[in-house]
Swiss-Prot record, chain A:
Membrane topology: Peripheral membrane protein
Disulfide bond listed as a keyword: yes
Position of sequence motif Twin CX3C motif: 35-59
Family the UniProt entry places it in: Belongs to the small Tim family.
Top-rank taxon: Eukaryota
Gene Ontology biological process terms, A to Z: protein transport
Protein name: Mitochondrial import inner membrane translocase subunit tim9
Protein's organism: Neurospora crassa (strain ATCC 24698 / 74-OR23-1A / CBS 708.71 / DSM 1257 / FGSC 987)
GO cellular component terms given for this protein: mitochondrial inner membrane
Subunit structure: Heterohexamer; composed of 3 copies of tim9 and 3 copies of tim10, named soluble 70 kDa complex. Associates with the tim22 complex, whose core is composed of tim22 and tim54. Interacts with the transmembrane regions of multi-pass transmembrane proteins in transit.
Compartments (UniProt record): Mitochondrion inner membrane
Length: 88, 90
């Protein structure tokens, strides 16, 4: 990839793995923030209500489907954009 | 080293260049997810599955996000060139 030596490639892989951990934590953090904001609005009890809990489960499922679907589209569009840039 | 050719980038520079390129793509991806979720996903979460309408909206949102990216990038390039490379105070 981009004319890196094996050692450079290994170094890059290590850095990318660290990034991936960070990225996962940020996706997880955003998920908590979004689903909490969308679903939790009743502070008359300290435990999540059945309604809130159900909402959170559905929010997580839907967000995962959203991530997957947008991930596919992003891959396609990014590949097309890269190809177009190289053609110019 | 011996005055031959242009200076070779160091290992650190080469790695940083690839890393940076990937970072730009990853950032664009996470911005798109955030924005298209806001634009398309019903916030009541009565359903755990994406509806047909939401799915179509996400696809179109992704497409338009890229088109907007390209359009603004082209326009900025044109403006910058028109101002003799010194556009937008950069």
């Amino acid at each position: 990839m981009d004319g890196l030596t094996a050692a450079e490639s290994r170094e890059l892989d290590q850095r990318l793995q660290k990034r991936q951990v960070k990225e996962f934590m940020s996706v997880f953090g955003n998920l908590v923030d979004n689903c909490f904001t969308a679903c939790v609005d009743d502070f008359t009890s300290k435990a999540l209500s059945g309604r809130e809990s159900g909402c959170i489960s559905r929010c997580v499922l839907k967000s995962m489907s959203t991530q997957t679907r947008l991930g596919e589209r992003f891959g396609e569009l990014n590949a097309a954009m890269t190809a177009e840039m190289q053609r110019r | 080293m011996f005055g031959l050719g242009r200076p070779q980038p160091t290992s650190a520079e080469k790695i940083a260049a690839v890393e940076n390129e990937l970072k730009v793509v990853a950032e664009m991806h996470s911005r798109m997810v955030k924005i298209c979720t806001l634009k398309c996903i019903d916030k009541t979460y009565r359903e755990g599955d994406l509806s047909k309408g939401e799915s179509v909206c996400l696809d179109r949102c992704a497409s338009k996000f890229f088109e907007t990216h390209q359009k603004i990038s082209d326009q900025l390039q044109k403006e910058t060139q028109a101002r003799g490379g010194g556009g937008f105070g950069m």
